């Protein structure tokens, strides 16, 4: 009989996007149950991955009463399912499921830390975040930081004294190199968005403050004034409530003739192929998939010196690394990328650097090996 494992995230989109294909792979070796808040993405996961799913409502934000209800629901679920392992990702699912699994005495309790919020927070908020992550670690038997930067921050802030393990070279699920490739079909689609004799900078992600959008738009505005043969393509949704960009930034995005906002896109590959440079000036990350994806599509990347990004990108090899929240450094990096010879040199190494370290099936092999080591 296969051992049972439960994989959790707070919202179903995380299971859908971050663990694509991984749950199906694991189901060949274990009985897999996927758990998250309800939603159409959870139904999508069940059909695509071929695993059983269970909906347990969980709030992303702090909500003591609702969190308590979610905790009791998870305890009831774990009592009923009696899994060998509970493995969570995302903060709230991690906190609640590790507590519930500890109460239920589940033998193997794993939490994967992706992006950490507390290193860039301050005051009471930072103390609360550190406390909740410390509780998660106290209840877990095994802790998996997504990369070296997350590993370093967990140690630096003394979140736990337990051993920390990174799977492979980092990242949750690796990169599907067959999907993220310049196939003839993608090249054809990209022609709709390409502009000749224009250097296109592309950003993919939420259009929010802590992705560095204010600095990016301001730096590009200056760049375009000096070099009119430039364009900025933004792929991703605005967020009105959580961390919105400045009003003047949004106005510039909507009105500037050389800035094209594409909104949410199910397939970002044509936009990457239609661009010359990928720009990701985020303030904080765990291990950004989108930088892996841009590199796999052959783009040199400009990234900030933050966790994950500075592990994927090597200075002057497949991109350049700049200080976070530094508009002038961003401007200078974008200006440097206008040199075609420099771009091509970095682009040649972009895909090989990703393929050698983050190929998906290689990471799956390492994850499965790690799971097997816990079976005892």
Place the predicted regions along the sequence by residue:
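A short, well-ordered alpha-helix in the C-terminal region of glycosyltransferases
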Residues: 342-357, 366-368
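Aromatic "clamp/platform" in nucleotide-sugar-dependent glycosyltransferases that forms part
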Residues: 264, 283
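Nucleotide-activated donor-binding/catalytic signature segment of Leloir-type glycosyltransferases, i.e.
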Residues: 236, 246-263
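Conserved acidic donor-binding segment of nucleotide-sugar-dependent glycosyltransferases
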Residues: 315-316, 320-327, 336-341
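Donor nucleotide-sugar binding/catalytic pocket of nucleotide-sugar-dependent glycosyltransferases
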Residues: 54-55, 134-186
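A conserved mid-protein helix/loop that constitutes part of the nucleotide-sugar donor-binding site
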Residues: 16-21, 199, 203-222, 328
């Amino acid at each position: 009989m296969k051992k049972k494992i439960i994989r959790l995230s707070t919202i179903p989109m995380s299971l859908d996007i971050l663990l694509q294909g991984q749950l199906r792979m694991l189901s060949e070796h274990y009985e897999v149950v996927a758990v998250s808040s309800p939603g159409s993405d959870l139904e999508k996961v069940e059909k695509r991955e071929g695993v059983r799913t269970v909906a347990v409502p969980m709030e992303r934000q702090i909500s003591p009463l609702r969190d308590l209800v979610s905790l009791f629901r998870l305890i009831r679920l774990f009592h009923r399912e009696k899994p060998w392992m509970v493995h969570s990702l995302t903060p709230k699912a991690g906190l609640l499921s590790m507590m519930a699994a500890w109460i239920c005495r589940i033998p193997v309790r794993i939490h994967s830390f992706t992006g950490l919020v507390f290193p860039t927070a301050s005051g009471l908020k930072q103390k609360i975040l550190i406390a909740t992550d410390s509780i998660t670690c106290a209840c877990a038997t095994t802790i998996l930081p997504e990369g070296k930067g997350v590993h370093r921050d967990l140690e630096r802030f003394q979140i736990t004294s337990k051993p920390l393990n990174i799977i492979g070279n980092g990242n949750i699920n690796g990169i599907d190199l067959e999907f993220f490739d310049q196939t003839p079909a993608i090249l054809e689609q990209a022609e709709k968005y390409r502009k000749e004799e224009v250097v296109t900078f592309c950003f993919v992600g939420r259009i929010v403050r802590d992705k560095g959008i204010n600095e990016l738009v301001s730096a590009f505005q200056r760049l375009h004034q000096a070099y009119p043969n430039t364009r900025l393509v933004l792929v991703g949704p605005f967020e009105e409530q959580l961390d919105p960009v400045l009003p003047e930034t949004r106005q510039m995005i909507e009105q500037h003739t050389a800035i094209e906002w594409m909104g949410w896109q199910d397939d970002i590959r044509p936009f990457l192929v239609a661009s010359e440079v990928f720009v990701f000036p985020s303030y904080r990350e765990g291990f950004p998939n989108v930088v892996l994806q841009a590199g796999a599509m052959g783009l040199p990347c400009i990234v900030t010196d933050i966790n994950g990004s500075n592990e994927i990108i090597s200075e002057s090899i497949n991109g350049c690394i700049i200080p976070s929240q530094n508009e002038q450094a961003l401007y200078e990096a974008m200006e440097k990328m206008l040199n075609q010879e420099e771009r091509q040199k970095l682009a040649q190494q972009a895909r090989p650097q990703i393929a050698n370290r983050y190929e998906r099936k290689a990471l799956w092999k390492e994850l499965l090996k790690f799971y097997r080591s816990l079976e005892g």
